[in-house]
Amino acid sequence: MKTRAVRLYGESDLRLEEFDMGELKDDEILMELITDSVCMSTYKESIQGAKHQRVNDDISEHPIIVGHECAGIIREVGAKWKDKYQVGTKYTMQPAINIKGSMAAIGYSYEYCGGAATFIKVPPIVMEKDCLLPFDENSAFFEASLAEPMSCIIGAFHSMYHLSLIHISEPTRQAEI
């Protein structure tokens, strides 16, 4: 299976390439990507290359596909996942897989899985950690691509629980931190 993708080879070394990903394995899923949002952390990753904490050390020999805020359609399902995932279904991914002892993440660590591609092979760890997430058939792909950054915003608001509001009627009162 061929794909066209933006791959990272090193510091400030991004290349748009068409390449073969090989045959789909029984524990993988093939997705056609429709959208990928651009994130500042992808920019940071492209500048730092292998110095980035989530990027593999050997990207000059095994480049990774950048991008992690993506959504697409399942086009082929490996035998292991046929009971859980169906061809033609719309999905997005949670990029931070949270593997104990590892910083691996979609768009930073995988040779055939990242958002800036036409097709990707989703590695088994994504399904094992329930990080391949379906979304409503009536929702736009861009909405699913924005799920991860939106969760960051919501998380930031929730983390502000320790702050109280400054009351307009009491102009001398300071916010409690």
Which stretches of residues belong to each language-model region?
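Glycine-rich beta-strand-centered segment in the early N-terminal region that forms part
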Residues: G22-D36, K51-K100, G114, D136
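Short Gly/aromatic-enriched secondary-structure transition segments
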Residues: K44-H52
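Extreme N-terminal starter segment of soluble prokaryotic enzymes
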Residues: K2-R4
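NAD(P)H dinucleotide-binding glycine-rich loop of Rossmann-like/cofactor-binding domains
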Residues: I97-L165
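Short cysteine clusters
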Residues: C39
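Extracellular beta-rich ligand/substrate-recognition surface
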Residues: R7-D13
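Single conserved hydrophobic/aromatic residue that forms the stacking wall/gate
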Residues: I166-I177
